[in-house]
Amino acid sequence: MEKDIINILNEKASTKQDVYRKTQEIFIDLQKVLKQKANRIFKEIKEKDKNIEVSFSSKGKFEAQIKFSGETLLFHMHSNIFTLPNNHSLCKTKYIKENPLRSFFGVIHVYNFLSDSLK
C-alpha cells in the first residue's frame, strides 16, 4: 500500500513538473514572438506618427507586456499547475479516461488594461 502511494505521488509530481516545464517553454516562446511583433509594429507606426508608443517589456519568467499607447496587454503565466475537475466534459473523453494524468494543464492569462491604470 505504501509503495502504491509513493508510486502515485511520484507519477503525479513528475507529470506536474513536465507540464510546468512545457508551459514555461511556451511562455518563453510567446515572449519572443511578442517582442518581435511589437518591434515590427513600432517600426511601421513610427514612420506615420512618432507619438504612438508600441513597446514590449518582460517582467521576468512569469509576466510580459505589450503597450499600444493607451492600452496594455499583460501576459501572465501562473506558477501552479491545475487539473480539470472530474465532472468537466473533457474528463469524459477517451483521451483522459485512458490516462487521468492528461487532465493537468498550465495557465497563461492575457489581460487588456488601459495603460494609465497600470501606472
Locations of regions flagged by a protein language model:
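Contiguous, amphipathic alpha-helical segments that mediate oligomerization or scaffolding
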Residues: 4-53
